[in-house]
């Protein structure tokens, strides 16, 4: 390369360093989530689908609280209006260190029992996976929460037994503002 000429593409290590600096300047390296990362009350509405069944309405509420030691609690209650499906109650307790993007949690589920899980916090999505402890059916599940805006998320989730889906849920979550 002669004097005054520029390379057509920077070396790979320089390329990633440049992208990181640009991301910082544009603020896209910062997490903008309000669900889970801030205390609050969220209303859920959507549909629940079980294997070989028709979708049914699901409604619910989630409360998120934090203490000073980076521990969070989350309580969710799901109801199925107009259906004989039993309500679902979930009690989470987890820890997320300041600046971290990964966390672990314990969950008490009124149908599945004791559950352990982990979560990852992306730029626009929170993904959780969990597994039921001491379970002969090898049940596990996942949740993906996609941020629509500060007050709204879209949730998709599924529960599996072994390698097979047994149920899925898709719902919107809307933050309830307190006065």
Label every PLM stretch briefly.
Residues 10-14, 18-24, 40, 95-97, ...:
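Alpha-helical context
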Residues 131-179:
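Glycine-rich, aromatic-bearing surface loops/beta-hairpins
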Residues 2-87, 165-179:
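Amphipathic/hydrophobic helical signal segments and adjacent flexible N-terminal regions
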């Amino acid at each position: 390369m002669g004097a005054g000429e520029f390379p057509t593409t920077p070396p790979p290590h320089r390329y990633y360093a440049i992208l990181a600096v640009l991301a910082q300047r544009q603020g896209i390296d910062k997490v903008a989530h309000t669900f889970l990362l801030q205390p609050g009350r969220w209303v859920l509405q959507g549909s629940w689908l079980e294997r070989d069944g028709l979708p049914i309405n699901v409604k619910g509420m989630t409360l998120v609280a934090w203490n000073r030691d980076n521990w969070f609690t989350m309580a969710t209650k799901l109801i199925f209006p107009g259906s004989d499906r039993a309500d679902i109650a979930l009690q989470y307790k987890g820890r997320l260190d300041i600046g971290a993007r990964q966390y672990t949690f314990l969950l008490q589920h009124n149908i599945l029992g004791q559950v352990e899980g982990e979560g990852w916090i992306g730029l626009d999505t929170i993904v959780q996976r969990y597994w039921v402890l001491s379970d002969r059916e090898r049940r596990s599940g996942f949740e993906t929460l996609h941020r629509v805006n500060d007050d709204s998320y879209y949730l998709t989730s599924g529960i599996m037994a072994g390698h097979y889906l047994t149920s899925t849920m898709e719902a919107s979550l809307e933050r309830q503002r307190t006065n």
